[in-house]
Amino acid sequence: MRHTMELTMVGTGSAFSKKFYNNSALVEFSNGYRLLIDCGHSVPKGLHALGFPLDSLDGILITHTHADHIGGLEEVALYNKFVLGGRKIDLLVPNTLVESLWENSLKGGLRYPDEGSPEPELSDYFTVRSLKTSSYGVAHTQIEENMAVRLYPTVHVSHMDSYAVGLVDRGEDKVFYSSDTIFDEYLIDYALTYSWVFHDCQFFTGGVHASLDELLSYISEEDQSRVFLMHYGDNMEDFFTKAGMMRFALQGRTYIL
């Protein structure tokens, strides 16, 4: 068993990026479990480009139901069913999202049964693992031995449940992964209790993501050295030297943590 976690940025782009794949990370825990965080419509292509076939995944965790975070799930479901002989991987879903993920997003393309079979459900394609959530703070779920995730509610868009993720490996708070959130001082305080922080950013203030200026103004220079920026626009290179001690997470790069 390895004693390190590896995180590969499959995609680092914003929802409207044409230069980068949808923001997504492939995390390999020290026990060997490979967890994909979010699976937007361009993520299966991004995995292929990096040499990770879909059958190399053990599970997928969904943080919210925007298309750039779930749009590739239909492809994964159908590929596992028809190409991989019905293989089912874990689908880790916050308990507040399980129903809407199927009824409002995936059912339209996956509801059609085989001849003579009943109409399928989400559990016919994935091993659905409902994750605990809390409206007011952190919720902890043990996934396997020496492996756990924590969910933190975020404010992203009105009336949509969304979550940041804390990754715990061998009892160590390794990575805080913001997914999508507006600037939130309290959330950043939680984030900085982890060894490493991967935080979404945009290059203007206002809107539905934390801005680079807001992050720079709040996070100390010492802590900035532990922060990687992700979910950015195609003009990222214009800001490459304007991020203080923070670094931009690079698409295709594997980080040993």
From Swiss-Prot:
Organism this protein belongs to: Bacillus phage 010DV004
Residues noted as binding Zn(2+) 2 in the record, renumbered to the chain: 64, 66, 156
Top-level taxon: Viruses
The record's free-text note on cofactor binding: Coordinates 2 Zn(2+) ions. One protomer coordinates the metal ions and the opposing protomer provides the catalytic residues required for cCMP hydrolysis.
A Gene Ontology biological process term: symbiont-mediated suppression of host innate immune response
Region (Beta-lactamase-like): 21-231
UniProt keyword terms in alphabetical order: Host-virus interaction, Hydrolase, Inhibition of host innate immune response by virus, Metal-binding, Viral immunoevasion, Zinc
Chemical reaction(s) catalysed: 3',5'-cyclic CMP + H2O = CMP + H(+); 3',5'-cyclic UMP + H2O = UMP + H(+)
Gene from which the chain derives: 152
Any one GO molecular-function label of the UniProt entry: metal ion binding
InterPro entries given in the database record: Anti-Pycsar_Apyc1 (IPR056308), Metallo-B-lactamas (IPR001279), RibonucZ/Hydroxyglut_hydro (IPR036866)
Protein name per Swiss-Prot or TrEMBL: Anti-Pycsar protein Apyc1
Transmembrane segments: none
Subunit structure: Homodimer.
Cofactor(s), names only, from the UniProt record: Zn(2+)
Pfam families: Anti-Pycsar_Apyc1
Sequence similarity: Belongs to the anti-Pycsar protein Apyc1 family.
Protein's job: Counteracts the host Pycsar antiviral defense system. Phosphodiesterase that enables metal-dependent hydrolysis of host cyclic nucleotide Pycsar defense signals such as cCMP and cUMP.
Entry binding sites for Zn(2+) 1: 68-69, 180, 231
